[in-house]
Amino acid sequence: MLQSYCIQGFKSIKNATEVDLKKTQYQTLEKTNVCNGILKGCMFVGANASGKTNLIEPLRFLLMALFAVREMKWKNFLCLFSDADMFENTYRFLIDNAEIEYTIRYQNTDKLLVERLVLDGKVMMERTGATAKSKITEKKVFNGIPNEGLFLRDLWFNTRFRGHEVLQKWFDFLRASQYVNMETGLMMSFGEDQSLRIEKYIEEHGINEINQFLDECGFSFHLIHHPERNAGETGFGNLTVKRDGIMLEIPM
C-alpha cells in the first residue's frame, strides 16, 4: 500500500509537501478504513485553485512514467513559481511489511534525471543521468541510459524483477491502480485487461450490486439492463434508469 509521498517543485507545489497516509489514533473508522496501519483512502478539501488536483497528480505521474509513456517531457512538470528549476518526488510503500522508497528528481538546468530505489534501507538501484548501478540484476553498472524515460521502467520490462518477490508484488500493486478524473472524464488503467467501461463490468457482474448500492444510499431510482440492445460507444446504450413509482424508463 502507499504509505506516503513527498513532492517539491512539482506543478503548483513549490515547497516540500508530504502526504502521509499512516493512521493516527482516530479509531471511528479503523475497522473498515485502515489496513496494516495505513489509511485505505483520503480526501482533500480546499478552495478552488488551492492545489488539490496537483496533490494527487504525482500519483498519476508515477504510473504514467512507469507503464504508459516511455518518453516523458520532464520540464512540463516543473513548478512555475519556483526558482530552483527542479522537482523531486519521493514515494513510500509498504509491501509484505517491507518498506520501499522510490525517488525521482529532475534538474532542468543540467537536464539531469536522478532515480533511487531503496528496499528496507538498502539501496537497490541508483541512477544519475545516463549511468546507473543496480543490485536487482546480474549486470551491476549501466551506461547510455536515455534521459527521456525511467531506468526503473526498463529494469522491470527486461527482468520482471526475477528473484525479488517484494518488488514483483510492488509492481503488481502499481499495475492494478486506476486513475479516474470525474471533472475531465479521464479514466486510465495501467494493468493488462483492466477495463473501466461500464458494459464490461455489467457483462461480468450484472447490475444487482449497483442497484443494491443505490438502495443502501437511499436513491429513488434503479438501473435496468437490456442485453439485447447495443451498448454503443458510450457503453450506456443498453442501460435505462427507472425512478420508483414511475413506469417510464429513461435512457442513459
Task: Describe each model-derived feature in a short phrase.
Residues 1-60:
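Pre-Walker A-like glycine/lysine-rich segment at the N-terminus of P-loop NTPase domains
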Residues 4, 18, 88-92, 101-103, ...:
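Beta-strand secondary-structure signal
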Residues 14-16, 99-101, 247-249:
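Short, mixed charged/polar active-site loops
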Residues 37-43, 47, 56-108:
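Conserved P-loop NTP-binding catalytic core
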Residues 41-49, 233-252:
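Conserved ABC ATPase signature
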Residues 87-92, 112-121, 232-246:
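Short polybasic amphipathic segments
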Residues 105-231:
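Electropositive, glycine-dotted interaction segments
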